[in-house]
């Protein structure tokens, strides 16, 4: 159904922030005030059997408020931004129809961008093409494939590191399937999308006024994961014949480093240091995405009363007392 000039889009509050910024605490605080259902905006939480390393909400927390898009696929499978977009638009409609309030919460900014801005017409993943590229990478190395990408799509290659296997593979896959550089397809106008036009997405962004404080939280969280049995969790996954480091699930922060430790490639201390560093790099990318959203409502996530501030911002959004600019 088209959104007429008279219809008012439904406001959807979105709680976005980097790792360890307090999203779960703020979401649960809102759940104590309103009948909400949380839709996860997190590419790691979709995987089953990956609980500790993804800092998945506990069973108790998930019992207190309905959560969606958590534990929905096996680690051997893939989940795309397009799938997230379709699932989220469907879920929002179902939650509203139940008389509840949807709250989007997470830190996968690519998913949020796909939801709010739409998707370009890129070809879907092809397992055969990916297997071919994986075999070439095993033989020649990802820097060699990066060099090939630079010849056919210099714009995309210029923004990717030579060892960024996931993105190099995707860019080459797109070219092999479409015959066009991914940069050209991404620059093409997005098709009109009436489904998302029914909603106004308002982001409340949890950002640190002092990044060093957030970095300390990240280190504490990683150590807590290790103490909670993270290495054992990865070992159980590693024993499966159908899982390997080339899969998106095993590229999640921390899992690759723990896997390398279990393989004997690095020692325990190096694994810990690399895991924390990778998490900090993810945090940096997440903050960069957030700061590119001029319409966001910023809450300092390291303030002593950050949960109360985030709760206040979310309630003002939902009450119509504040809106995206």
Curated annotation (Swiss-Prot):
This protein's record includes keyword tRNA processing: yes
Superkingdom, natural source: Bacteria
Protein name: tRNA dimethylallyltransferase
Binding site for ATP: 17-24
InterPro entries referenced in this protein's UniProt entry, alphabetically: Dimethylallyltransferase (IPR039657), IPT (IPR018022), P-loop_NTPase (IPR027417)
Gene: miaA
UniProt cofactor(s): Mg(2+)
Function: Catalyzes the transfer of a dimethylallyl group onto the adenine at position 37 in tRNAs that read codons beginning with uridine, leading to the formation of N6-(dimethylallyl)adenosine (i(6)A).
PANTHER family given in the database record: TRNA DIMETHYLALLYLTRANSFERASE
Gene Ontology biological-process annotations: tRNA modification
Location of the region described as Interaction with substrate tRNA in the Swiss-Prot/TrEMBL record: 42-45, 166-170, 251-256, 284-291
Keyword terms, alphabetized: ATP-binding, Magnesium, Nucleotide-binding, Transferase, tRNA processing
Catalytic reaction list: adenosine(37) in tRNA + dimethylallyl diphosphate = N(6)-dimethylallyladenosine(37) in tRNA + diphosphate
